[in-house]
């Protein structure tokens, strides 16, 4: 799956601990935080539903190796993969802004004019 910009896979930014619960580097990009939160959500979803990599692959059409790579932070999944996983579980896995570390909001566009 192609990556945008020069971001590394999410796991690249893990400092210590066990993925996906490891602390991320201070300079980890947004994609790493989202990837980590997605992996946590996927882990919880699989645990709560009893799915294995293979049963989830059968239910979604996503290969078990791709699901494993998403769960292990070794790939940035594409939208189609996320959509198929969410459809199989019946709930949202994509974390949204809640995955981001606390930061100052961006100034409004009118503030810089």
Stretches found by the model and what they are:
Residues 80-95:
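DNA major-groove recognition helix of helix-turn-helix/homeodomain DNA-binding modules
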Residues 49, 60, 88-89:
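Core residues of bacterial helix-turn-helix
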Residues 53, 64, 79-82:
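Helix-turn-helix DNA-binding elements, focusing on the entry/boundary residues of the two helices
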Residues 46, 57, 86:
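The alpha-helix within a helix-turn-helix
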Residues 61-76:
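Recognition helix of helix-turn-helix/homeodomain-like DNA-binding domains
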Residues 52-59, 67:
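Short alpha-helical "recognition helix" segments of helix-turn-helix
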Residues 1-44, 104-113:
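N-terminal flexible/basic segments that precede or flank functional cores
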């Amino acid at each position: 799956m192609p990556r945008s910009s020069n971001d590394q896979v999410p796991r690249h930014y893990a400092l210590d601990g066990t993925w996906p619960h490891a602390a991320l580097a201070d300079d980890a990009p947004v994609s790493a935080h989202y990837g980590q939160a997605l992996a946590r959500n996927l882990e919880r979803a699989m645990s709560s539903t009893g799915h294995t990599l293979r049963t989830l692959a059968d239910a979604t059409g996503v290969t078990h190796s791709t699901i494993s790579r998403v769960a292990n932070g070794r790939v940035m999944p594409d939208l189609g993969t996320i959509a198929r996983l969410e459809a199989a579980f019946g709930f949202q896995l994509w974390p949204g802004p809640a995955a981001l570390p606390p930061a100052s909001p961006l100034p409004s566009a009118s503030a810089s004019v």
